[in-house]
């Protein structure tokens, strides 16, 4: 019986070593991105924006890019610290509100001006274009993947159904950001700043009379149960205000990715990704509003005349902002005009 020839020992060892090296190289190509944000895992943004974005990136990279998600500040810190966590490399990606750091993003916050935006799907790509054109210096150390706004802030009131400007006088209302504080002050309310998760309990206990929030976040906060009245601008008119959001990645982490994985990140970033993010925010409005309707909550739609009064009352916010940033060498009027023009040009 003829025995099969035996493979020499050294070639077998070499082949095994090469196989292990190839496997190690493949493993090295796999990157897990730590993604941190401040909303609950049941929130619209987590379920319908961040998770799908991560799934798409994983699929298009053939599994080489994966996200490890940390909602609700699970990695510690506070929401205003998220941007620096990404910049410093504590995490790889964050979804955050840049303007939670008052005064640090003066160019970005122009999109939070009163009565500037109506639909997030239109305003969000405009915001991305605006930042790329005018405000990248505010994002040193990170790569903005996409930016967006919410579906528009309205007033969710605990017991008082605000119908006229005078009704707001002296009421304590939660403000989301620095400009939100100024807007509420201009309307006659007493602005109170607090984190989003604290709002429902604050209204329930009477710490505040209401909150300036979008419908998009209302359901995860159960605002429809806590607030009894909702104050909105008429259809076709810009909302009282909005908030700017950004998904940003540590620049060094991005720069260290293989070219093929950078392409995947790039394909899921930019103007169209921002438009999609805005669409996700807008899509949450109708279902959230319906929950409040089904509960029999009161809805107040400001009349055209009353809306005009609110717009006039908050015009000083625009003027004050322009003067403030101009004193820092920033052409505030040009930035505000550009923001309006970029929103108008969107389909």
Specify the residue positions occupied by each region the protein language model found.
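Bacterial N-terminal signal peptides
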Residues: 12-25
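N-terminal secretory signal peptides that target proteins for export/translocation
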Residues: 1-10
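N-terminal secretory/targeting leader peptides
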Residues: 2, 29-122, 137-347
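Signature of the catalytic double-stranded beta-helix
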Residues: 125-132, 137
């Amino acid at each position: 019986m003829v025995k099969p020839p035996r493979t020499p020992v050294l070639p077998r060892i070499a082949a095994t070593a090469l196989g292990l090296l190839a496997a190690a190289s493949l493993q090295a190509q796999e990157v897990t991105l730590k993604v941190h944000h401040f909303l609950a895992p049941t929130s619209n943004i987590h379920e319908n924006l961040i998770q799908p974005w991560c799934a798409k990136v994983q699929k298009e990279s053939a599994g080489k890019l994966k996200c490890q998600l940390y909602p609700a500040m699970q990695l510690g810190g506070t929401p205003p610290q998220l941007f620096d966590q990404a910049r410093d490399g504590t995490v790889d990606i964050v979804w955050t509100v840049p303007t939670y750091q008052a005064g640090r993003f003066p160019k970005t916050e122009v999109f939070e001006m009163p009565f500037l935006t109506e639909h997030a799907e239109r305003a969000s790509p405009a915001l991305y274009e605006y930042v790329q054109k005018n405000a990248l210096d505010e994002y040193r150390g990170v790569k903005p993947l996409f930016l967006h706004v919410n579906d528009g802030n309205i007033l969710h009131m605990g017991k008082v159904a605000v119908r006229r400007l005078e009704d707001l006088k002296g009421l304590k209302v939660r403000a989301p950001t620095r400009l939100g504080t100024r807007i509420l002050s201009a309307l006659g309310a007493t602005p109170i700043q607090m984190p989003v998760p604290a709002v429902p309990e604050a209204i329930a206990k009477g710490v505040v009379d209401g909150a300036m929030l979008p419908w998009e976040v209302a359901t995860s906060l159960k605002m429809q149960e806590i607030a009894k009245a909702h104050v909105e601008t008429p259809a076709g008119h810009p909302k009282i205000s909005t908030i700017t959001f950004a998904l940003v990645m540590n620049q060094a982490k991005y720069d260290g990715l293989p070219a093929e994985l950078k392409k995947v990140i790039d394909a899921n970033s930019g103007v169209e990704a921002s438009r999609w993010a805005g669409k996700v925010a807008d899509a949450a409005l109708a279902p959230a509003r319906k929950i409040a309707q089904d509960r029999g909550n009161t809805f107040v739609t400001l009349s055209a005349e009353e809306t005009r009064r609110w717009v006039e009352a908050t015009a000083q916010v625009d003027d004050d902002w322009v003067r403030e940033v101009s004193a820092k060498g920033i052409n505030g009027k040009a930035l505000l005009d550009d923001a309006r023009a970029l929103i108008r040009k969107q389909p």
